[in-house]
Amino acid sequence: MAKLTKRMRVIREKVDGTKLYEINDAVALLKELATAKFVESVDVAVNLGIDPRKSDQNVRGATVLPHGTGRDVRVAVFTQGANAEAAKAAGAELVGMDDLAEQIKAGEMNFDVVIASPDAMRVVGMLGQILGPRGLMPNPKTGTVTPNVAEAVKNAKAGQVRYRNDKNGIIHTTIGKVDFTPVQLKENLEALISALKKAKPAVAKGVYVKKVSISTTMGAGVAVDQATLDTAN
């Protein structure tokens, strides 16, 4: 058996894997166990009661967290004309059409989010094999294909998170940094859960939000008691 690191031993001693933690207790535990030499992200895994094999039960979308994610987000926008000027004014780092596509083909990928106006999709469509595997392909469901690119840029900068269930029906995303206050992390988590509930597929049956766990980048998952969250039903 592999030898446990000191950190893993402490986590095993502190975290009860069979327990649902009140949200404030869960956050306090994460902060106590966050001993990495960098400011760790706080990640969430939400198990949904869906059948991910069926396309009409897949959950995908985006929501702006009230306190952001703590990350500086670099945005690339495919658009032209007045929309290009609006995107720059909103804070986009990269704006263009064919010229931007050529940069990406050359391997210049210094951005975290890609946004496109509908008329630019003819250009973006040719980048599917590059952007797709990286989760960067613009999509109307996540608000990244839109006529109002300026608003999309502002949302991305304000701490918008995009979510999509994996093959096991689990949503993985980030809700902030470990140096956020407990209130900020709680309200960000509540905003995400509320958005997921609004995105519930009409055909999904039974319990929809089955389990909510939070963790830091280097830590173990802590299961949250949903009754201690203030979310829309």
Swiss-Prot record:
GO molecular function, one term: rRNA binding
Domain of life: Bacteria
Keyword rRNA-binding listed: yes
Entry GO terms, CC: cytosolic large ribosomal subunit
Entry keyword set: Repressor, Ribonucleoprotein, Ribosomal protein, RNA-binding, rRNA-binding, Translation regulation, tRNA-binding
InterPro entries assigned to the protein according to its UniProt record, in alphabetical order: Ribosom_uL1_bac-type (IPR005878), Ribosomal_uL1 (IPR002143), Ribosomal_uL1-like (IPR023674), Ribosomal_uL1/biogenesis (IPR028364), Ribosomal_uL1_3-a/b-sand (IPR016095), Ribosomal_uL1_CS (IPR023673)
Function noted in UniProt: Binds directly to 23S rRNA. The L1 stalk is quite mobile in the ribosome, and is involved in E site tRNA release.
NCBIfam families, per database record: rplA_bact
Complexes and interactors: Part of the 50S ribosomal subunit.
PANTHER family (UniProt xref): 54S RIBOSOMAL PROTEIN L1, MITOCHONDRIAL, LARGE RIBOSOMAL SUBUNIT PROTEIN UL1M
Record protein name field: Large ribosomal subunit protein uL1
Organism: Shewanella sp. (strain W3-18-1)
